[in-house]
């Protein structure tokens, strides 16, 4: 469609309601048109000054005639008042995750499976579509009669969170669709941040003395999940759409759906249609070479069967469709100088060496810090302070130093030595025999206390909306909280005067803290931050014992009778509940009404029913997601390898668990092997 007529740069203000209504509609139409040209098509037709004049006139008219303000007006993108909590949204069509391929051979194997399942009669009709796998936050947009009525996060694929007001603030998300869309249409896509915007955002945070975000994905996800949509509106978010949920039946193919989305005024992921797998593989290779030139973060190429009818015939396994696969790129790497090694203290007292680097650009992100894991890792790799080193970054994984470049040494390099005293509290540290981690044993160490509060409020534990790291640090530094029990003694009037909060946000935070009392005991147990006790282990223990029983004294022998709880975990639990400081904390939490009752176990059956699996190393998706898949298939995830372990799922850098599995003869699976078990293509041995 052509551009609507531009107004005068200094327009007269309409005085009559009827005249104002007509002018408001004209302005909204013009602004939507130019939003599409600028944010979707990247082809602006007017100057910023001209656009600002349109916007100012609309603001002035809506101010004079507030009855003309509508939720889908361009002026309403600023966000509105904060929410008290996110409401759940059940996806009518599940937002499935994808199988992964890391080698070309795996793409060919997938192609062969697709052809085998479709049969020879479909050979001539089979087409593939490739599109970039953007590293952001997956969301869905529901339009009814062309108007945006709801936006939601992917969540677990079946239930997400309602983030409509947050997504409305994104300029590339239109409130109304062009052309003639179906009555119900649910485009799906990835919210992300361009690399240059990410760098600028972090630069400003550092100037204000705030901690920078680790990567663009974390910033995008955190921005959308802000209870206050005004915060979202200030973040430089954009979106690419890659598919359709509800309403997909209106299209014959994926490529047809993408073309329609573009016609409706939505930003569509760059994509190509292919006639065979060789062409797909060539395209993956081209993007692998070009990815560092892109202005957004990608971690692979998604390959999809184009025909909707063929997709339906292929179906899905567990949480992944058979008709799509993600080809993952190799991790990005850069070369820089290791200036220093500093030591940080975590919530369990673990001292972790961290590399201080000369800033280096890796995949469009400037990296100045990277993990060195532990003292043994540094020695095994032969890393010296002052070395030239190779740094890798894969997806949202923390950057890591993978090796030094010894040939570039000049003799001024120094060996790293782990400090003998905690760098925060000054107490002596120790490294237990057989462990790789040096620890501060002072339970009153401020660094441990703060990290414990941050962990307690996290989504996997008590999920306290609005209590992020920044606010937790501020409350801790002001002396308002010293441990997690103090959270339940906070009052809104204490919080409201704090910079960046205010009365409404303070009340919302207090409500969120109160709601955390409803979390089941396994979440509380995980939130306590006991060494070796992850979310899966906490669930196993909480199914057998209550908090009161653990306080009274449950022995190592009783705990190890729980399937999946080994001696190391059991001793850690017993030690935790034997320390008077911890017992006082648990008693206070009980007095505040938190849930310490046992959790009823869930009967499970599936292809991994009765099997015990351990996960180790870096995987292509979050470990919690892998655990969910295993447990959804009837399996149990445990934390340590023993003779009772049926499988070890090993990613990159698997560590000592892989050696232990080999010693005991435990079968080792990569992600593809696990996928075959989950899908039923292979039966457990």
UniProtKB/Swiss-Prot annotation:
SUPFAM superfamilies: BRCT domain, DNA ligase/mRNA capping enzyme, catalytic domain, Nucleic acid-binding proteins, RuvA domain 2-like. One of its GO terms (biological process) is DNA replication. The active site is at 133 (n6-amp-lysine intermediate). It catalyses: NAD(+) + (deoxyribonucleotide)n-3'-hydroxyl + 5'-phospho-(deoxyribonucleotide)m = (deoxyribonucleotide)n+m + AMP + beta-nicotinamide D-nucleotide. Pfam families: BRCT (PF00533), DNA_ligase_aden (PF01653), DNA_ligase_OB (PF03120), DNA_ligase_ZBD (PF03119), HHH_2 (PF12826), HHH_5 (PF14520), Nlig-Ia (PF22745). The keyword DNA-binding does not apply. One of its GO terms (molecular function) is DNA binding. Coiled coil: none annotated. NCBIfam families: dnlj, PRK07956.1. Belongs to the NAD-dependent DNA ligase family. LigA subfamily. This is DNA ligase. The gene is ligA.
């Amino acid at each position: 469609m052509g551009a609507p007529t531009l107004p005068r740069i200094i327009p007269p203000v309409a005085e009559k309601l009827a005249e104002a209504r007509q002018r408001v509609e004209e302005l909204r139409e013009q602004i939507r048109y130019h939003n599409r040209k600028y944010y979707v098509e990247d082809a602006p037709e007017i100057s910023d000054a001209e656009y600002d004049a349109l916007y100012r006139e609309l603001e002035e008219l809506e101010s004079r005639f507030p009855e003309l303000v509508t939720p889908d007006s361009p002026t309403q993108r600023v966000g509105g008042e904060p929410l008290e909590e996110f409401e759940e949204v059940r996806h009518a069509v599940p937002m499935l995750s994808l199988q992964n391929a890391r080698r070309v051979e795996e793409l060919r194997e997938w192609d062969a499976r697709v052809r085998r399942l479709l049969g020879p009669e479909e050979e001539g009709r089979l087409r593939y579509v490739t599109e970039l796998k953007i590293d952001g936050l997956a969301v869905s947009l529901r339009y009814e009669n062309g108007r945006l009525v709801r936006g939601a996060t992917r969540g677990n694929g079946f239930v997400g969170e309602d983030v409509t007001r947050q997504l409305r603030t994104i300029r590339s998300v239109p409130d109304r669709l062009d052309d003639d869309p179906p009555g119900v249409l649910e485009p799906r896509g990835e919210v992300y941040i361009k690399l240059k915007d990410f760098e600028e955002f972090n630069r400003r945070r550092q100037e204000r003395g705030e901690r920078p975000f680790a990567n663009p994905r974390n910033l995008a996800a955190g921005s959308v999940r802000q209870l206050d949509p005004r915060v979202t509106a200030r973040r430089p978010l954009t979106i690419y759409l890659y598919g359709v949920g509800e309403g997909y039946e209106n299209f014959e193919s994926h490529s047809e759906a993408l073309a329609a989305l573009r016609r409706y005024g939505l930003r569509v992921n760059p994509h190509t249609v292919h006639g065979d797998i060789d062409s797909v593989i060539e395209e993956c290779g081209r993007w692998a070479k070009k990815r560092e030139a892109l202005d957004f973060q990608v971690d692979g190429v998604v390959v999809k069967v184009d025909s909707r009818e063929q997709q339906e015939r292929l179906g899905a396994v567990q949480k992944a469709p058979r008709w799509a696969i993600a080809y993952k790129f190799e991790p990005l790497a850069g070369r820089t100088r290791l200036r220093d090694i500093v030591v940080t203290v975590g919530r369990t007292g673990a001292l972790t060496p961290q590399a201080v680097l000369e800033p280096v650009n890796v995949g469009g992100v400037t990296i100045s810090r990277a993990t060195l894991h532990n003292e043994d890792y540094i020695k095994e790799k032969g890393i010296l302070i002052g070395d030239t080193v190779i740094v890798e970054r894969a997806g949202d994984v923390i950057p890591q130093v993978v090796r030094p470049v010894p040939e570039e040494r000049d003799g001024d390099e120094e060996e790293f030595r782990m400090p003998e005293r905690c760098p925060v509290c000054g107490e002596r540290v120790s490294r237990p025999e057989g462990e790789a981690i040096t620890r501060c044993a002072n339970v009153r160490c401020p660094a441990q206390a703060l990290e414990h509060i941050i962990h307690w409020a996290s989504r996997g534990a008590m999920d306290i909306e609005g209590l992020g790291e920044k606010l937790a640090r501020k409350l801790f530094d002001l002396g308002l909280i010293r441990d997690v029990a103090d959270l339940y003694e906070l009052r809104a009037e204490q919080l409201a005067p704090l910079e960046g909060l205010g009365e409404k946000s303070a009340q919302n935070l207090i409500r969120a803290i109160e709601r955390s009392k409803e979390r089941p005991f396994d979440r509380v147990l995980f939130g306590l931050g006991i060494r070796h006790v992850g979310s899966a282990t906490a669930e196993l223990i909480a199914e057998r014992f209550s908090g009161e029983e653990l306080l009274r004294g449950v022995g190592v022998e009783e705990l190890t009778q729980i399937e999946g709880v080994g001696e190391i975990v059991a001793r850690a639990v017993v030690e935790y509940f034997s320390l008077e400081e911890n017992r006082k904390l648990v008693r206070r939490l009980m007095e505040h009404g938190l849930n310490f009752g046992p959790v009823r176990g869930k009967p499970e059956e599936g292809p991994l029913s009765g099997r015990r699996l351990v996960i180790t190393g870096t995987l292509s998706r979050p470990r919690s997601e892998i655990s969910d898949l295993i447990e959804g298939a009837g399996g149990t995830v445990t934390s340590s390898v023993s003779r009772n372990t049926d499988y070890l799922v090993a990613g990159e850098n698997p560590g000592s668990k892989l050696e232990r599995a080999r010693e005991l003869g435990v079968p080792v699976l990569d992600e593809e092997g696990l996928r075959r078990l989950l899908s039923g293509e292979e039966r457990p041995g």
